[in-house]
């Protein structure tokens, strides 16, 4: 009688032993490699990536945006590097990016097409750089943008065309720049804006500040910030808070052209409009002169005549008047 045989279960047991830890090995291999070169093909090689689409490339002294960006990226941290300029298509391939951090890079140049393809971007941080100007259309592709920080740059002027129409933008940080006023029409293209950070700028309290003050009356700043948004000129208004100015304070400022007037200028053209304006001025001056002359004539007609002088003055040359009976001419006539 043969004893029990274990030859048949052994292959099955070995197979179970080999297969049982496989999910653990797979999980370890997928999560233990932080860089793109070790198990994360959608991550730039020099960066550290974590599940959820976050790529951290902070403080690596990078001179440019690293290659290898993919559609799986949701957040890209490039702060504290040396990215001095953003060329066209700098973030090609990252069309699903929602957050982009470019703080403290010494950035001084942004190409007008640098952000093309980032239609899903919601947060853009360009603070603490060296930007002095932004080309028209720079942010035009960012239709989903909700938070934009330009704080701590060297911006002396911000044109409406640079921001473009950002219908979802809710927060705009402009503090610590060199802004004396905001260009007319800039805030009007940001219908969802409800947080505007302005402190640390040399605001000039003149007529150019009227649109900003009107916006601040509709969207009051927090008390802590309202006390720090101050005028630096003219002298009599130095250190006056912007929130203290009512619309009556700008009553001496010329009103901008209405839409109807702008439509007339556009239809006629600049040259034709100037000719028409000169003709209207000449016609108005002529009518005013005619009315003044008519008024003088009417006043003269209503004035009573002067009575005759009973004692006329003698002729200044010593000659007798023809009506004087003692004159030689009167004697000859007699």
Swiss-Prot record:
Residues 34-71 form the LRRNT domain. Residues 1-26 form the signal peptide. One of its GO terms (biological process) is potassium ion transmembrane transport. InterPro entries: Leu-rich_rpt (IPR001611), Leu-rich_rpt_typical-subtyp (IPR003591), LRR_dom_sf (IPR032675). Residues 27-261 are extracellular. Residues 304-313 have a biased composition (Pro residues). The chain crosses the membrane at residues 262-282. Isoform 1 is expressed highly in normal prostate and salivary gland, very weakly in colon, pancreas, and intestine, and not at all in other tissues. Isoform 1 is expressed highly in many cancer cell lines and in breast cancer, pancreatic cancer and colon cancer. Isoform 2 is expressed in cancer cell lines. It is a single-pass type I membrane protein. Glycans are attached at residue 147. Residues 298-334 are annotated as: Disordered. Residues 201-255 form the LRRCT domain. It is found in: Cell membrane; Cytoplasm, Cytoskeleton. Interacts with KCNMA1. The transmembrane domain is necessary for interaction with KCNMA1. Auxiliary protein of the large-conductance, voltage and calcium-activated potassium channel (BK alpha). Required for the conversion of BK alpha channels from a high-voltage to a low-voltage activated channel type in non-excitable cells. These are characterized by negative membrane voltages and constant low levels of calcium. This is Leucine-rich repeat-containing protein 26. It comes from Homo sapiens. The lineage of its organism: Eukaryota, Metazoa, Chordata, Craniata, Vertebrata. The gene is LRRC26.
